[in-house]
Amino acid sequence: MSDRRQNRKTPDEQRKANALIINENIEAYIAICKEVGLNGDEMLILENGIAIEKAIRICCDGKYQEKREKKAREAQRADSNFNADSIGIRLVKRAGSGTNITYHAVVELTSRSRIVQILKSHWGNELNRAKIAGKRLGFSALFASNLEAIIYQRGRNAARRNGSAELFTLTQGAGIETRYKWIMEKHIGIGVLIADAKGLINGKREGKRGVDANVKLRAGTTGSPLERAMQGIEKKAFPGPLRALARRVVKANYNDAREALNVIAEASLLLKPQITNKMTMPWCMWLAARLTLKDEFANFCAYAGRRAFEVFNIAMEKIGICSFQGTIMNDDEIESIEDKAQVLMMACFGLAYEDFSLVSAMVSHPLKLRNRMKIGNFRVGEKVSTVLSPLLRFTRWAEFAQRFALQANTSREGAQISNSAVFAVERKITTDVQRVEELLNKVQAHEDEPLQTLYKKVREQISIIGRNKSEIKEFLGSSMYDLNDQEKQNPINFRSGAHPFFFEFDPDYNPIRVKRPKKPIAKRNSNISRLEEEGMDENSEIGQAKKMKPLDQLTSTSSNIPGKN
């Protein structure tokens, strides 16, 4: 047995290790919340949690701060009062008591140095080490990327620039900040690595600096950034000719290298690549779960397995989600908290590209396709309508997919033609095999005979699956279970429904797009950074909330929240 397997932690040991990190994150989150004046239930408002985590990631981004300090030096020549260390965070706060509670938006000022000081007091002084802050903030960045994938389909634009927009289901983690991308490599889709590899190939051709830099590779060696990217692609690619293609890219000429990467990406729509899936929640949700579970909290610090679903449900009972005026489609429309709860659930579990009918079969409430949702961008808006605890819960669970979906021996530009599985549940193939074959047939013949042989083998694999699509199943032998079925005694068979694609166009629903004319951009307060798009005075209020039942009447133990008066 290898040393790696011998050193593998048991589930109890892993949860205990997770709890140490999660508790440190929670304590840092509470301290920063207090620093910007958040107390009690305000810490459990989802939009506040997202804003605080974004501020932390930016404050820990050295390159961003270097650029900002450079701009600050230029600004100070024109404005001696400019403070490069100051940042503003847009937050939701409440006023009043009892049944007369209102919520309003404010921008609170703090400083990067103060946030870094708080983080060091909880995590240690070496924040630049991946082991200290990298993984913590990497999972935070992964959640933010998952959120953007659902709201904006961020991966689609990247896929379109680098080949076909139909490849967007391979772009998990496309929105992760560059600093955390390689730390989180095993959680990132193969399409993102392929886009990076193409960028490096283009950069080499154009003579850009940095493409020949020396970076760390696996097994303690060093090499170029392209070699590092291709190592990641080879590891993720379906076994067989796709991996052989990946090994040839580094030494291939420009045209052959790009062509080989296109084949790997397009074939991966059906020959599904490997990706490690985990549940990742914002720190405000972990705080909510800890308040409920108390001494039992460590037993639920899981990123996979049944307890990951349970701790998510527990957190959902206590958090608050804001409804603002203004959605992606209509500036005058009020957001739906039910829709935002669905987006939150899908972002925590990375479900943007999972079979939507499978996700629908695992939760307590009906779900909507993306184009039916009334949601904004999960930032704090101008007019707060309501703040409520969501009702959505998981009723079933499944193991996360960590292996290949298939056994190794086996004109609608931009439309979704494939799924990327998150849960290891046996299901029929949903991929449009004919469209994959059309994409692969666009490959032009070049002189490199070994490449042509590999292309032929890839097409043969695709063709075999296409001919036997009705008989072949992904994740053969795996099932989902009721949430109380801890021992997997009663597997539940899954049959894909009418809507396997979350981004499927719904012809029966045609929302009216209403956008107000853009207001002239006011001069930005020079003491507020570009962390948020708008600047304002520290004590300004934006909008007035409707009267509603307060969060502390919706939750049972809110009096235990740190900072609660």
Swiss-Prot record:
Biased composition (Polar residues): 553-565
Region of interest called Disordered, as start-end residue ranges on this chain: 520-565
Superkingdom, natural source: Viruses
Keyword flag RNA-binding: yes
GO cellular component terms, A-Z: helical viral capsid; host cell; host cell nucleus; ribonucleoprotein complex; viral nucleocapsid
Keywords: Capsid protein, Helical capsid protein, Host nucleus, Host-virus interaction, Ribonucleoprotein, RNA-binding, Viral nucleoprotein, Viral penetration into host nucleus, Virion, Virus entry into host cell
The record's account of how the chain is modified after translation: Late in virus-infected cells, may be cleaved from a 56-kDa protein to a 53-kDa protein by a cellular caspase. This cleavage might be a marker for the onset of apoptosis in infected cells or have a specific function in virus host interaction.
MF annotations from Gene Ontology: RNA binding; structural molecule activity
A Gene Ontology biological process term: symbiont entry into host cell
Cellular location(s): Virion; Host nucleus
Role description: Encapsidates the negative strand viral RNA, protecting it from nucleases. The encapsidated genomic RNA is termed the ribonucleoprotein (RNP) and serves as template for transcription and replication. The RNP needs to be localized in the host nucleus to start an infectious cycle, but is too large to diffuse through the nuclear pore complex. NP comprises at least 2 nuclear localization signals that are responsible for the active RNP import into the nucleus through cellular importin alpha/beta pathway.
Protein name per UniProt: Nucleoprotein
